[in-house]
């Protein structure tokens, strides 16, 4: 038996990963390839395609359910208000979860290598390999390393009789998981092109209809919908269906990829939009001004690491230390209204609210704790003093 006995391949059953199967044997010298498909909320049709293709290739095929782990990571992202250039990181967060699951199978099956079918232009190659290169297994990227083109893959599949009908997987490149659905490619790559309505599956065009829902949080984690406790996966799936019917969660952005490429991306993410908006509204109620300002910096750094797929980085641990310190007060409920394609917070309640109705009222003389309105006179005199002084100095100098 050779030193290169078995390799675990991230397997979708699509063109890229299908041609990788024989190439890993012919070009890299592996005796056996095993395919691993990780469930992070893809459509059932994708698993059927992977299973049928694996069977046609006589490929040992493993399916791993990682939806619970992925949902937990998504809720960590909610606590960090995680978003990258308007995108709630669905694909980015899924990749390290998928990579970890594949690595675990590879070790259990005695593999000496792990492989993926990502190209050398995208982000996924980096996210997968950031996890895998922390192991002692060989990391292989046939599409990137062999410089494969779409045309070559189609011709190669046809010559070898690989189970790819026409070598065409559809007009657009689509990635779906619990947290988001991305649509890219073809005419959508042109920034000036107006996408047709039929690119969307999770969301419908907004109408005049509205709906209000109540989202409950404990320690910053979403835990309930309209008073009913739900597990993370069920809560996300329910909100995707519910909010999607009101057109909530569409994003059309120019995204700066990790390798410096600027690309156009279209996303659908109803549940993510609702939960992120609700969480931010509750934080605004319970955190102090200074905490809110500093947490924006922490959230930004967490989002950058999340986009890079580096959710296990030491920096993320440190950032989450601060986040944990703030989230024990992010407990309460937020009422969200679906209206015109938006998920708008219209009410929020918490026992930790940093708010005093008496102090904020225009109908009371006292502010709070024995402080009266007239006590603000001294503060008002000093406020802006340095700026006034600076302007006088500047004006005097200009007159000379």
From Swiss-Prot:
Keywords: Amino-acid biosynthesis, Arginine biosynthesis, ATP-binding, Cytoplasm, Ligase, Nucleotide-binding. Its EC number is 6.3.4.5. SUPFAM superfamilies: Adenine nucleotide alpha hydrolases-like, Argininosuccinate synthetase, C-terminal domain. ATP binds at residues 10-18, 117. Its main location: cytoplasm. Transmembrane segments: none annotated. Pathway: Amino-acid biosynthesis; L-arginine biosynthesis; L-arginine from L-ornithine and carbamoyl phosphate: step 2/3. GO terms for molecular function: argininosuccinate synthase activity; ATP binding. It is found in: Cytoplasm. L-citrulline binds at residues 87, 123, 127, 173, 182, 255, 267. The keyword Secreted does not apply. It catalyses: L-citrulline + L-aspartate + ATP = 2-(N(omega)-L-arginino)succinate + AMP + diphosphate + H(+). PANTHER family: ARGININOSUCCINATE SYNTHASE (PTHR11587:SF2). Homotetramer. This is Argininosuccinate synthase. It comes from Natronomonas pharaonis (strain ATCC 35678 / DSM 2160 / CIP 103997 / JCM 8858 / NBRC 14720 / NCIMB 2260 / Gabara) (Halobacterium pharaonis).
């Amino acid at each position: 038996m050779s030193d290169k006995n078995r390799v675990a391949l991230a397997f979708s059953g699509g063109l890229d990963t299908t041609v990788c199967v024989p190439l890993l044997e012919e070009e890299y010298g592996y005796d056996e390839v095993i395919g691993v498909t990780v469930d992070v909320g893809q459509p059932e049709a994708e698993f059927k395609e992977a299973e049928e293709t694996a069977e046609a290739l006589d490929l040992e095929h493993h399916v791993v359910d990682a939806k619970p782990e992925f949902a937990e990571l998504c809720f960590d992202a909610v606590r960090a208000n995680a978003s990258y250039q308007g995108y709630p990181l669905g694909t980015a967060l899924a990749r390290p979860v998928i990579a970890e699951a594949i690595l675990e199978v590879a070790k259990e099956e005695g593999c000496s290598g792990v492989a993926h079918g990502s190209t050398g232009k995208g982000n996924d190659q980096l996210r997968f390999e950031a996890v895998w290169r922390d192991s002692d297994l060989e990391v292989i990227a046939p599409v990137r390393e062999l410089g494969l083109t779409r045309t070559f893959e189609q011709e190669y599949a046809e010559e070898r009789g690989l189970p790819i009908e026409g070598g065409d997987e559809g007009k657009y490149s689509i990635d779906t998981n619990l947290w988001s659905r991305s649509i890219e490619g073809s005419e959508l790559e042109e920034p000036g092109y107006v996408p047709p309505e039929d690119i969307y599956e999770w969301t419908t065009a907004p109408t005049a209809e509205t709906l209000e829902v109540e989202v409950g949080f404990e320690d910053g984690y979403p835990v309930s919908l309209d008073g009913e406790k739900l597990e993370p996966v069920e809560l996300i799936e329910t909100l995707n269906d519910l909010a999607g019917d009101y057109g909530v969660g569409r994003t059309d952005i120019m995204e700066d990829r990790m390798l410096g490429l600027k690309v156009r991306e279209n996303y659908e993410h109803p549940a993510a939009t609702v939960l992120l908006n609700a969480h931010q509204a509750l934080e605004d109620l319970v955190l102090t001004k200074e905490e809110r300002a500093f947490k924006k910096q922490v959230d930004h750094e967490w989002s950058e690491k999340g986009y890079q797929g580096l959710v296990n980085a030491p920096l993320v641990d440190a950032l989450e230390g601060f986040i944990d310190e703030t989230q024990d007060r992010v407990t309460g409920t937020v009422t969200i209204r679906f209206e015109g394609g938006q998920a708008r917070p219209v009410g929020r309640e918490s026992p930790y609210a940093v708010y005093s109705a008496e102090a904020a009222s225009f109908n009371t003389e006292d502010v709070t704790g024995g402080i009266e309105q007239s006590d603000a006179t001294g503060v008002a005199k000093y406020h802006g003093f340095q700026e006034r002084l600076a302007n006088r100095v500047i004006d005097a100098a200009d007159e000379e």
